[in-house]
Regions:
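Glyoxalase I/VOC metalloenzyme domain signal
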Residues: 1-21, 25-48, 58-107, 122-214, ...
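Short glycine/proline-centered loop/turn elements that form peptide/ligand docking sites
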Residues: 51-52, 200-201, 218-223
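Active-site/pore-lining binding-face segments in mid-to-C-terminal subdomains
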Residues: 110
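Short, small/polar residue-rich loop motifs at catalytic or cofactor-binding pockets
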Residues: 113-116, 274-276
Length: 295
């Protein structure tokens, strides 16, 4: 049972996010196998092969860089990345990727979070990937979350936020599209979900970077944060691996670095050091982070 709940204001605003995700860097056990999976399953294209990594993304931008160096696949009892979410800008593209995954025989879990539609899958090392279509316009308000997730849509219907998507209905939006086409150019890193040792210190840390608290479920060991609007699930964290877990070993597959882009002046934070035009540090999950501005 969920013991305590804190929910920030969930009013949807037209304000631009203060922060967005830049390039995400992952360490894998077999670089060639990983590149083959990410390109075949998701339709990412190779943008750069400068040693030692391979940059993958859309025709417009790099989303991830895969690095060799991991010796063992993902193991659960450590902090680090829980999953990486890649966002689609349209229902048609989301549905087309679902069709692609099915055609490629990739195991996938289509899930309706109400605020978003999501497709969950894993790469060969066990890294979890989420393909998401953000749908904040479907969400109205939270119910009594002390007894489990209860989300109300704009028609007043309650949802668990964890139900299955209607696959047939989703695929209808991809009718006539080529599932084997590359990912649309406007694909983007939608959010990162971390495994952390404790919620409160991690929430405090990310607040100094410009994120704001949204939903905190202490009894469920989960919290998420926004960065302005319209989506309030720009960063998530959990303690499901257990409290006070150590960071992932250096030889394990996982997230090794990510960029955050500030849309405006950089926030003053004691947790990152200045390095030329950027700020660098290590987050509460033990992952290297670079914060830069787009101005």
């Amino acid at each position: 049972m969920l013991k305590s709940v804190a929910v920030a204001d969930t009013t949807i605003s037209a304000q631009r996010d203060r922060l967005s995700w830049g390039v995400v860097e992952l360490q894998v056990t077999d670089l060639d196998r990983a590149v083959a999976f990410w390109t075949s399953a998701l339709g990412l294209i190779v943008r750069d092969t400068a040693a030692p990594g391979v940059a993958l993304g859309t025709r417009v931008r790099t989303l991830i860089v895969l690095h060799p160096g991991a010796v063992v696949p993902v193991k659960a009892p450590f902090t680090g990345m829980y999953h990486l979410a890649i966002g689609m800008r349209s229902q048609a593209e989301f549905s087309r990727l679902l069709a692609r995954l099915i055609q490629r025989n990739v195991p996938v879990a289509p899930t309706d979070h109400l605020m978003a539609k999501s497709l969950y899958l894993h790469d060969p090392d066990g890294l979890e990937i989420e393909i998401t279509l953000e749908t904040p316009e479907r969400f109205s308000h939270f119910g009594d979350m002390s007894r489990g997730p209860r989300l109300y849509d704009v028609d007043g219907i309650v949802h668990s936020g964890r139900g299955p998507l209607d696959v047939r209905a989703e695929l209808s939006h991809a009718a006539g599209a080529d599932p084997m086409a590359p990912m649309a150019g406007d694909g983007y890193v939608a959010h990162l979900h971390f495994k952390v040792a404790a919620l409160e210190p991690a929430l405090n840390w990310f607040e100094t970077l410009g994120f704001e608290r949204h939903l905190t479920l202490d009894g469920w060991g989960f919290a998420d944060m926004g960065a302005g609007a319209p989506n309030t699930h720009r960063l998530a964290m959990n303690t499901w691996a257990g409290p006070n877990r150590p960071p992932m070993p250096q030889d394990m597959a996982g997230l090794v670095h990510y960029e955050l882009i500030a849309h405006g002046d950089l926030a003053a934070t004691p947790h990152l050091r200045q390095d030329g035009d950027v700020r660098r540090g290590t987050d509460p999950a033990g992952v290297a982070v670079t914060l830069r501005t787009d101005i």
